[in-house]
């Protein structure tokens, strides 16, 4: 059975983030943010991809698996049940289903993939819903990585 990891960088530095990825044996980071930019240094798309490449890891942005704006607003307000409801509806869209198939193909090809988003707590993040949806497409074991806080 393939394994897929998840990680949130909310409380991490680039160093502790990459250490957690290395400890988890990650080879490719799949960015599941709708908008791959960040106020946290080193976590916007181009810089993140460069940091990962320096560490010997690949990067792919799966934008259509990102949370719609209304889901991000619900998450910021701590309305996690609403976020889950909005995101499940989003997962039913053709674009999200296609991106999920792309993710399944990547995971099925063999590299250890890690789903990336901001939220530190996987139970409050849509990446857990992505992992669950992936498990409906291909058999995967899900492991949540937790970078050290700094």
Each language-model region and where it sits:
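Residues lining hydrophobic/aromatic ligand-binding pockets adjacent to catalytic sites
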Residues: 1-150
């Amino acid at each position: 059975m393939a394994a897929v990891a998840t990680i949130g960088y909310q409380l991490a530095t680039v160093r502790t983030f990459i250490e957690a990825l290395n400890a988890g044996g990650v080879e490719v980071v799949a960015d599941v943010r709708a908008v791959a930019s960040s106020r946290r240094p080193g976590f916007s798309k181009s810089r993140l991809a460069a940091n990962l490449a320096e560490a010997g890891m690949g990067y792919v942005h799966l934008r259509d698996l990102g949370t719609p704006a209304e889901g991000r607003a619900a998450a910021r307000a701590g309305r996690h049940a609403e976020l889950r409801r909005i995101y499940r509806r989003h997962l039913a869209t053709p674009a999200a289903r296609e991106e999920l198939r792309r993710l399944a193909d990547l995971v099925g090809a063999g590299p250890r993939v890690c789903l990336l988003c901001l939220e530190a707590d996987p139970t409050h993040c849509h990446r857990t819903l992505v992992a669950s949806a992936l498990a409906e497409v291909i058999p995967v074991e899900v492991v949540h990585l937790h970078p050290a806080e700094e």
